[in-house]
C-alpha cells in the first residue's frame, strides 16, 4: 500500500463518516492538511458510568495504513482499565497484526487491514461499556473496577465525565 493509497482510503473513510454519521462519535481532521491525524469526540455510552461524557481523543495513522493500526490517545482525562495514565488506548483491535508474544490475544482479535475508523470507534465505545480487566493498561483503575466498581471507581469516572462536559468544546 503506497502512501497515496493510504491517504485516499483515509479521505474516503472521513467522507463516509461525515455523510453517514455513526451514533456515539464524530470525527474530523486535527489539521486540514494532514489526513493522518484525526480528532474524535466520543459520547459516553448510555447506561454506563461514562454516560453523558464527551471525550476527545486523537487517532494517529501510520503512512502504511491500513496494513498497520493507528494509535489512539484520549486528550480528555478518562479513568478506565484499558486506557493508560497518558491517555493511550490499549485494546486488541489497535495492536499490531500477528501473533501475541504474550499469548493473551488471538491473531483475529488484533488489527486486520479490513478494519476502519468506524470499527475502531465502535470497539472503543464497547470498551467503555465493558472494560477488559484481564489485560489492563491502567492497573489501578482495573483493581478499582474489580474490587470497588460502585465506590471509588465510580467516583473517579463521574469526575472525569463532569470535567469532559466542562471542557468538551474548548
UniProtKB/Swiss-Prot annotation:
UniProt xrefs under InterPro entries: Ub_conjugating_enzyme, UBQ-conjugat_E2_core, UBQ-conjugating_AS, UBQ-conjugating_enzyme/RWD
Record carries keyword Transferase: yes
Modification after translation (UniProt): Autoubiquitinated in vitro.
Residues modified as N-acetylthreonine: 2
Modified positions (N-acetylmethionine) in chain numbering: 1
GO biological process: proteasome-mediated ubiquitin-dependent protein catabolic process; protein K48-linked ubiquitination; protein K63-linked ubiquitination; protein polyubiquitination; ubiquitin-dependent protein catabolic process
Reactions mediated catalytically: S-ubiquitinyl-[E1 ubiquitin-activating enzyme]-L-cysteine + [E2 ubiquitin-conjugating enzyme]-L-cysteine = [E1 ubiquitin-activating enzyme]-L-cysteine + S-ubiquitinyl-[E2 ubiquitin-conjugating enzyme]-L-cysteine
One Pfam family named in its UniProt record: UQ_con
Keywords: Acetylation, ATP-binding, Nucleotide-binding, Transferase, Ubl conjugation, Ubl conjugation pathway
EC number from the UniProt entry: 2.3.2.23
Domain called UBC core: residue spans: 5-166
Membrane-spanning segments: none
Name of this protein: Ubiquitin-conjugating enzyme E2 G1
Species annotation: Homo sapiens
Lineage: Eukaryota, Metazoa, Chordata, Craniata, Vertebrata
Amino acid at each position: 500500500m503506497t502512501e497515496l493509497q493510504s491517504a485516499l482510503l483515509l479521505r474516503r473513510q472521513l467522507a463516509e463518516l461525515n455523510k453517514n454519521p455513526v451514533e456515539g462519535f464524530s470525527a474530523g481532521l486535527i489539521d486540514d492538511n494532514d489526513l493522518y491525524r484525526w480528532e474524535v469526540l466520543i459520547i459516553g455510552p448510555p447506561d454506563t458510568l461514562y454516560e453523558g461524557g464527551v471525550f476527545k481523543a486523537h487517532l494517529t495513522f501510520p503512512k502504511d495504513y491500513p496494513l498497520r493500526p493507528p494509535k489512539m490517545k484520549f486528550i480528555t482525562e478518562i479513568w478506565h482499565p484499558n486506557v493508560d495514565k497518558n491517555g493511550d488506548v490499549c485494546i486488541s483491535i489497535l495492536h499490531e497484526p500477528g501473533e501475541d508474544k504474550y499469548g493473551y490475544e488471538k491473531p483475529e482479535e488484533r488489527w486486520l487491514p479490513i478494519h476502519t475508523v468506524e470499527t475502531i470507534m465502535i470497539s472503543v465505545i464497547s470498551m467503555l461499556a465493558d472494560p477488559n480487566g484481564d489485560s489492563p493498561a491502567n492497573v489501578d483503575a482495573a483493581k478499582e473496577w474489580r474490587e470497588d466498581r460502585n465506590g471509588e471507581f465510580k467516583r473517579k469516572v463521574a469526575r472525569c465525565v463532569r470535567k469532559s462536559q466542562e471542557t468538551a468544546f474548548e
